[in-house]
Amino acid sequence: MELVIAEKPSVAQSIATVLGATQRKDGYLEGNDYLVSWCVGHLVELAQPESYEEAWKKWSYESLPIIPQEWQHEVKSDTKAQYQILKKLMHDDRVDAVVCATDAGREGELIFRLTYNMAGCRKPMKRLWISSMEESAIRDGFHNLRPGSDYDNLYHSALCRQEADWLVGINGTRLFTVLYGGKALKVGRVQTPTLAMLVDRESKIMNFKKEAYYMAHIMGNGLDAVSEHISDKTEAERIAGACENGQALVTSVVKEEKWVAPPKLYDLTTLQRDANRLFGFTAKQTLEYTQSLYEKKLVTYPRTDSQYLSNDMEGTAKNVIEAIFNSLLFEQNVMFNPDIKRILNSKKVTDHHAIIPTMEIIKQDLKAIPESEMKILSLCANRLLCATGEKHIYNSTKAELTCNDTVFKVSGKEVWKNGWKEFEDFFKSSYKTTEDKSDTEEEKKLPELREGMTIAVEQTRVSEHFTQPPKHYTEDSLLSAMERAGNEDMSDDVERKGLGTPATRADIIEKLVKDGFVKREKKQMIPTEDGMKLITILPDVVKSPKLTADWENELTLVSKGEVAAEQFMSGIETMVSDLVKTYHSVSDEQKAMFGAGKSGQEVLGKCPKCGSDVVKGKFGAYCTGKCGMNVGRALGVTLSDSQVKSLLQGKKILVKGLKGKKGSYDAYLIPESIEKFSYTKDGKEIKGFQYKFKMEFPQKKVSMGK
């Protein structure tokens, strides 16, 4: 009997149906000599620092660097029940072998291996490696199971990625948090260089100084020809005025036939980019929608970095294209002879081929698919048609005209064969897209022009323009930048380039938003003030996109067995150790960047009595000047940090639960002045200063009876 372990219940159900394991048990399915169960994502994770040493529990410079000699793992508390089921099944005497059926990729391999190892399983391991959840693909996959050892290098690469992220995250975050005090400054192996790219772009935008320039226009015979950029408006007006009612001589005409090749098929990153550009979907949303379609058997495996199909998929591609035209996706009747050969290239298919629809699109009721998923399915279908379509061909005309010794230029474009763009245009007309229309090039037909002909100038004008700053990143352009990071410094034979992988980039972006370092403004991704300051203080070794891209490339080499895992981890450990040695102290001015005072604690404001910093202490807010000013309590109630901040700014605060003779009550406290106080405790007189408040009472809500 074989135990099959999938990544999630829905996938396990699909596999069990094909295998004939139809009897439902507690946490698994059984039948036909198979047990089919599942993980729930990661069941096992790396242990926290305090699990290794008690000293590592405290955030202090002295405890750094934190580098475990032997890595420890622990079962996640919220998935412990399913882990126990899997452990019991692995040790079931009926089980002869275990089949890893988690997602066929680096992370899926890690999810299974950590569970398998944690359970102490030693039974033979096999690997199911498929790119589609169609029944035929699952059946073929089980007929061609591979030994688990074939994927040992992939597992080592996944483990290196996890341990490297832990080392850089734990040490980097703790180091810069304890140095700068105040709030936690989260550092990540991939998220920090991604943030650095956003900050670099934002700095260029903020420092950009726009400059006006002018262009003189001459118009006649349907033409609008323009001069070069002119910095002086008066000069532009003089040039335009000199050509009024004049004659323009055509001095140059260049006509060229140009073409745009069909696009490649989608890998995950290009799909995420288009979904963001056309529909405003975040990278994470697109991955979730595509994963759902994959589990519904409607598209192939989503976490791929390939844009081709393998050479043996020619028949599959033809059948899917026919299915697209026979489904409800595209109702337009067109004569189409797809060029399948151009999307086939086994040499450029890594673990998985490009994302395409499956034959299930003609078997299932597509009207039942949620709208967001339907948009992704339609995108994938449309891209398959575009990728196998004909070239988009157009005629380009560029002409120069001379009038009164000034050269004017005009250009035109005339499409004579729309080719693959026919499908793209039809797709865009079928959906309301959020595409920036300024990025699309319009067709502009020119009248017939010949060198030596003259054109009467019917009208002139001067237009004003301004130089433009770089554009803010959108998720579309950020994903592209992450994918290309470090490319200019890498040779052409390097396979993996960029920050993260197609499977991880969405989570990296979401983490930056969640941690408060990046905010979304419509489609734009903009670093927050904290994000800008964080990148300002971090060294290149943790924020350089190129260095991180180098690491990602090395992880790929680990997965191929070309670099030892120990070599990769040794480099990470050395970097972390050097980081701690190099950065051991910062100035008070630098600490103040993140709201920390000399003590390294978060500053809430200035003391109203002595002007010293009021900081957040272990037992509440207090004045570092030790002037006796009580700022952490008001009328016997301990104040929150936000209430203290408001008081120090002279604002009124709402305090609930104040004690009175008739019970507790709520009131607004408005600071008016400072007064002395004194009381005796345990025979000792305690004196100091406190706010004198004016009170306002909230209006009670009146209940309207019938």
Named regions from a protein language model:
Residues M1, A101-A104, G181-A184, K255-K264, ...:
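Conserved short loop/turn motifs at secondary-structure junctions
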Residues M1-Q162, W166, K432, P469:
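Intrinsically disordered, low-complexity regulatory segments
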Residues E2-L3, K25, T79, M90, ...:
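Basic, low-complexity terminal or inter-domain segments flanking catalytic cores
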Residues P9-A16, D33-V36, V40, K76-K87, ...:
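Amphipathic alpha-helical transducer elements in NTP-driven molecular machines
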Residues V11-A16, Y180-A212, H217, D224, ...:
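NTP-handling and nucleic-acid-processing catalytic cores
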Residues D93, A137-G220, K255-W259:
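C-terminal or mid-to-C-terminal helical accessory/interaction module adjacent to the motor/catalytic core
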Residues K233-Y266, Q272:
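Metal- or metallocofactor-binding catalytic centers and their adjacent structured scaffolds
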